[in-house]
Design a protein with these regions (language model features):
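Alpha-helical cap/lid subdomain in secreted, periplasmic
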Residues: 33-160
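Serine-esterase "nucleophile elbow" of acetyl-processing enzymes
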Residues: 1-29, 33-38, 42
Length: 160
């Protein structure tokens, strides 16, 4: 989710009646070394929502490798916990970097990785509209209204 204690976090936690631990902050990318099996509890649900930051700094093959390693690590630590991989939200600058692989390719890449790891996939681009006014910076980070919308839509998707 966008940030710790964001409106999206709060909406999601309330809708699912769960405590929420968010490790997707500060430009984080798929990074298996950050997984910590010594949390002191077993999660009821794990969501993985990386990809947009990876796209901005990694070639396709590195992104796929890192996603696979991260999901391998999640499955090794918590093999029985339901796992949901969430594709990236719309970003307003996705067409401004022709040297990168197409941003739209992320959804199917991550869907395939999710399938290989017995995880459900939720398309992030279907949870958040391409509306710059819902972003605090007009292209990447949802504002309060955008976070509220994302939290509600993600909660509904996870309940299905």
């Amino acid at each position: 989710l966008p940030s710790v204690n964001s409106l999206a976090d709060k909406r999601l936690a309330a809708a699912l009646d769960m405590a929420l631990l968010n490790q997707a902050i500060a430009g984080e990318t798929f990074h298996a070394a950050m997984l910590d099996g010594a949390l002191g509890f077993t999660p009821d649900l794990i969501t993985v929502a990386y990809g947009t930051n990876d796209w901005s700094c990694k070639p396709r093959d590195m992104l796929v490798r890192d996603a696979e390693e991260c999901l391998d690590g999640v499955r090794r630590l918590w093999p029985q916990v339901p796992l949901v991989v969430i594709g990236p939200l719309w970003r307003g600058d996705q067409d401004q970097f022709p040297e990168r692989f197409p941003f739209a390719d992320l959804q199917p890449l991550l869907a395939s990785a999710a399938e290989r790891h017995d995880a459900r996939f939720v398309r992030g681009d279907e949870l958040f509209p391409a509306v710059p006014e819902l972003m605090q910076d007009a292209f990447l980070h949802p504002n309060d209204l955008g976070q509220a919308l994302y939290g509600e839509r993600l909660a509904a998707a996870l309940k299905r």
